[in-house]
Amino acid sequence: MVKTALEEFAFLIPLLPALAFAITFFFGRKMPSGGAIVPILAIAASFVISFAITLGLLANPEEVISQSYSWFAVLNIGILIDPLAAVMLSMVSFVSLLIHIYAVSYMSHDAGKARYFAETALFTAAMLSLVLSDNILQLFVSWELVGLCSYLLIGFWFEKPSAAAAAKKAFLTTRIGDVMFLTGIIVLTSDLLKVSGGFQDGVYLLRFDEIFSYIPELAALQINILGFEISHLTIITLLFFGGAVGKSGQFPLHVWLPDAMEGPTTVSALIHAATMVTAGVYLVARTFPMFIAAPDSLMVVAYFGGFTALFAGTMGIVMNDLKRVLAFSTISQLGYMMLGLGLGTAIGLEAVGISLFHLINHAFFKALLFLCAGSVIHAVGTQDMRELGGVGKVMPITAATMTIAALALAGFGIPGTSIGTSGFMSKDPIIEAAYLFGEHSSNWIPYVFSILAALLTSIYIFRLIFMTFTGKPRSNYHGHESPAIMTIPLSILAIFALAFGALTRTGFMEFLEETFTNSFVNLDIGALAGIGENELVAAAGHEPLAVLWPPVIVALAGFAIAFVIYYLRAFSLGPLASMKNPIYRLLYNRYYQHQIYTEFFSIGIVYGIIAFLTQVVDVIIDSVVEGIGIVTVFVGEELRKIQTGVVQTYATALIAGVSLLIILVKLIMEVL
């Protein structure tokens, strides 16, 4: 393709925030506002470049930006910007920019604000680098850096034991997924070497275009497990999905995400909207050609996603902490995204479009929800909804924008029209695709999961709105509206939460699908779907109104339930919402997963392994130390015998040693 100025600047997208990290880390303490201006300007520049590239690709989707620098056949650093990467780059940089601007005021009184802005700049750089990667190994390196940054930011207030514990929990839990992801890369590399005939000059096998070109050969490799022939490609994609389960908070590795609320609220917004948790969804979307040739893996993705969406919703309806409700909503919405990708067995490439479209829209209204929560906490000083009430009277802008975000999360709109919130435009197509899958395969489980999750979503988000902003204050707080530097980002995000979906729906999803139709030469998604024997539904996108209305009806039902109970207070839940109720207690304690993981896995298994290894290591170390002591004494005694004090003896030993060295050198030279 013709080189453009934008292509030459593409490498600056992650580099500028990385440089901002270095500058802020070393000099931020001496600068106003902790050096916040440095990452803000850097991320703004990254957004401008990203958005300009996205506009260029909208005009010519096949004109991808691809730059690759190889070191022999084993290492490669490259940039790949196709429609999928372009929209992610624009979203990550834009949302991160607004969060950084908001944080100038939110973190203004924090003594560690310079460290905060340095770490958030690095966090953004790591995510941008992950999205830009043109090969799976480079993506994994950025993936690990994202995990490290989340650890640092969740534990930002490390002097608090709860924050330090939450950071360690997030780091260790996501490591389980990371090990699976790395194992998948190792298996993939081994298989690629097998089917390609080994390393070749000028060819880097782990580039995505190279991986995709060998999918038929990878699918042909089989392994017999308990009498079942399983494709190597199925194993690889399941391992990749295991990595995504950890990063994107899917069941059963979701337990770290609610505790991640221990960091500053702006960190929560960054993790839940623009960086950490979207990485897993992006991984599955980026490697989608591999998944569509392994339909069993896609079905696993669909089931886990659908179940997670419902499972998280059951816990969200009983939480009283403002941020924890939003955390469970994130887990649930990520489940929808995974469900959308998993439905690729039925709707093919459209799965990437509907899932990533929801990811982008979710980033806007989820960032808005968290920043509004931060605005309330910043002004009132508490995040317990039982102590709030009436906040809308003193914080009208925050209340209005958070209500807009709630409408988007619940998916309010008019079916069959272009009238609706961004969440309606992106979440409902996933539910509709689940319906088509059920109609086509008689498997209604994903649809049931998704429709029930939609009901719970509406209940818990409007429960939050009514408990926080309506009624009378339930404590002696003295609230006030946040300053303009905080409310302006809220207003901008509210506009996107309302209108982005309606303005971009059809064209945006078609643009995303261009990733695998025009961006990769010789990539035939139809042929790969045939390898997996997928039976694609031709009716996708043309559903009757009877299919379009149920998601909206359950959203209205959820609103009505929350309105009657928490706004009108027509009746009290009484003992139903108390710890005396075993079901409530089960949900409030999150199904006791933390206790199970801690006591069974951590204490029972891990401590047992540690105790065993400790004994083994102690024996080895003791033996080695004692052995070294014995050998040292023995060698010392023997060497003492040749220390005669006679100069002639020393001269003879020196000549003999030099002669031996000369002989060895000559022998080596002859061999070479």
Swiss-Prot record:
<keyword id="KW-1003">Cell membrane</keyword>
<dbReference type="GO" id="GO:0015990">
    <property type="term" value="P:electron transport coupled proton transport"/>
</dbReference>
<dbReference type="GO" id="GO:0015948">
    <property type="term" value="P:methanogenesis"/>
</dbReference>
<comment type="subunit">
    <text>The FPO complex is composed of at least 13 different subunits. FpoA, FpoH, FpoJ, FpoK, FpoL, FpoM and FpoN proteins constitute the membrane sector of the complex.</text>
</comment>
<protein>
    <recommendedName>
        <fullName>F(420)H(2) dehydrogenase subunit L</fullName>
        <ecNumber>1.5.98.3</ecNumber>
    </recommendedName>
</protein>
<keyword id="KW-1133">Transmembrane helix</keyword>
<dbReference type="InterPro" id="IPR018393">
    <property type="entry name" value="NADHpl_OxRdtase_5_subgr"/>
</dbReference>
<feature type="transmembrane region" description="Helical">
    <location>
        <begin position="79"/>
        <end position="99"/>
    </location>
</feature>
<feature type="transmembrane region" description="Helical">
    <location>
        <begin position="37"/>
        <end position="57"/>
    </location>
</feature>
<keyword id="KW-0249">Electron transport</keyword>
<feature type="transmembrane region" description="Helical">
    <location>
        <begin position="298"/>
        <end position="318"/>
    </location>
</feature>
<feature type="transmembrane region" description="Helical">
    <location>
        <begin position="447"/>
        <end position="467"/>
    </location>
</feature>
<feature type="transmembrane region" description="Helical">
    <location>
        <begin position="265"/>
        <end position="285"/>
    </location>
</feature>
<comment type="similarity">
    <text>Belongs to the complex I subunit 5 family.</text>
</comment>
<dbReference type="Pfam" id="PF00361">
    <property type="entry name" value="Proton_antipo_M"/>
</dbReference>
<dbReference type="GO" id="GO:0051911">
    <property type="term" value="F:Methanosarcina-phenazine hydrogenase activity"/>
</dbReference>
<dbReference type="GO" id="GO:0043738">
    <property type="term" value="F:reduced coenzyme F420 dehydrogenase activity"/>
</dbReference>
<keyword id="KW-0484">Methanogenesis</keyword>
<dbReference type="GO" id="GO:0042773">
    <property type="term" value="P:ATP synthesis coupled electron transport"/>
</dbReference>
<feature type="transmembrane region" description="Helical">
    <location>
        <begin position="337"/>
        <end position="357"/>
    </location>
</feature>
<keyword id="KW-0812">Transmembrane</keyword>
<feature type="transmembrane region" description="Helical">
    <location>
        <begin position="545"/>
        <end position="565"/>
    </location>
</feature>
<dbReference type="InterPro" id="IPR001750">
    <property type="entry name" value="ND/Mrp_TM"/>
</dbReference>
<dbReference type="InterPro" id="IPR003945">
    <property type="entry name" value="NU5C-like"/>
</dbReference>
<keyword id="KW-0813">Transport</keyword>
<dbReference type="InterPro" id="IPR053610">
    <property type="entry name" value="F420H2_dehydrogenase_comp"/>
</dbReference>
<feature type="transmembrane region" description="Helical">
    <location>
        <begin position="652"/>
        <end position="672"/>
    </location>
</feature>
<dbReference type="InterPro" id="IPR001516">
    <property type="entry name" value="Proton_antipo_N"/>
</dbReference>
<dbReference type="Pfam" id="PF00662">
    <property type="entry name" value="Proton_antipo_N"/>
</dbReference>
<feature type="transmembrane region" description="Helical">
    <location>
        <begin position="360"/>
        <end position="380"/>
    </location>
</feature>
<feature type="transmembrane region" description="Helical">
    <location>
        <begin position="179"/>
        <end position="199"/>
    </location>
</feature>
<feature type="transmembrane region" description="Helical">
    <location>
        <begin position="601"/>
        <end position="621"/>
    </location>
</feature>
<comment type="function">
    <text>Component of the F(420)H(2) dehydrogenase (FPO complex) which is part of the energy-conserving F(420)H(2):heterodisulfide oxidoreductase system. The membrane-bound electron transfer system of the complex plays an important role in the metabolism of methylotrophic methanogens when the organisms grow on methanol or methylamines. Catalyzes the oxidation of methanophenazine to dihydromethanophenazine. It shuttles electrons from F(420)H(2), via FAD and iron-sulfur (Fe-S) centers, to methanophenazine (an electron carrier in the membrane).</text>
</comment>
<keyword id="KW-0560">Oxidoreductase</keyword>
<feature type="transmembrane region" description="Helical">
    <location>
        <begin position="394"/>
        <end position="414"/>
    </location>
</feature>
<feature type="transmembrane region" description="Helical">
    <location>
        <begin position="136"/>
        <end position="156"/>
    </location>
</feature>
<keyword id="KW-0485">Methanol utilization</keyword>
<dbReference type="GO" id="GO:0015945">
    <property type="term" value="P:methanol metabolic process"/>
</dbReference>
<feature type="transmembrane region" description="Helical">
    <location>
        <begin position="483"/>
        <end position="503"/>
    </location>
</feature>
<feature type="transmembrane region" description="Helical">
    <location>
        <begin position="225"/>
        <end position="245"/>
    </location>
</feature>
<dbReference type="GO" id="GO:0005886">
    <property type="term" value="C:plasma membrane"/>
</dbReference>
<dbReference type="GO" id="GO:0008137">
    <property type="term" value="F:NADH dehydrogenase (ubiquinone) activity"/>
</dbReference>
